[in-house]
Amino acid sequence: MHAIVVAVPTDAEITFADHAGRLYARRYGMAPVVGRLLGYLAICDPREQSIAELAEALLASRSAIAGAVKTLEQLGLVRRSRAAGERMDRVGIDLTSRRALGFDPTEYQEQAALAREGLAILADAPPERRAVLLEWTAMAEWLVARLPEWEKDWQAHREALRAAGELPGDTTHSDSEEAR
């Protein structure tokens, strides 16, 4: 087993993580530590770090980091991994899932189903009362229909960027995934 050296974050890296924390708190109502963690994981070296290393780098408690990891895992944005012989998990950004990239249609399928449930309740109501649910259903179904095409467009665009040298090779896998 070999030790992994983790660099102390620079002021600029911590500022970036703080900016991510504010963005995710303001935009998505998440606890600032969730955004700070995601921002830091986007720039840290190595790309995967333990809960303790992340807590030390972000000057946060281990329990706050563990809670933020749980939130980001539920969103499909991070993944825990453990190298052979290690006793602790390492956390890194995971861009391998459709959900992490924003192309998972299930969120919108569930929204459409919920809106249709509301429409069934309001089956005899005037169109004005049903308007919000009708538009909600239409928008969700429209997104479900388009997401597969947008995902293919993104994959083609990403490959073009890689071919042009504007994106490095495969950035979708974590360090431990690459080692497998």
Where do the PLM segments sit?
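Short helix-capping/hinge SLiMs at alpha-helix to coil transitions
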Residues: 27-28, 42-47
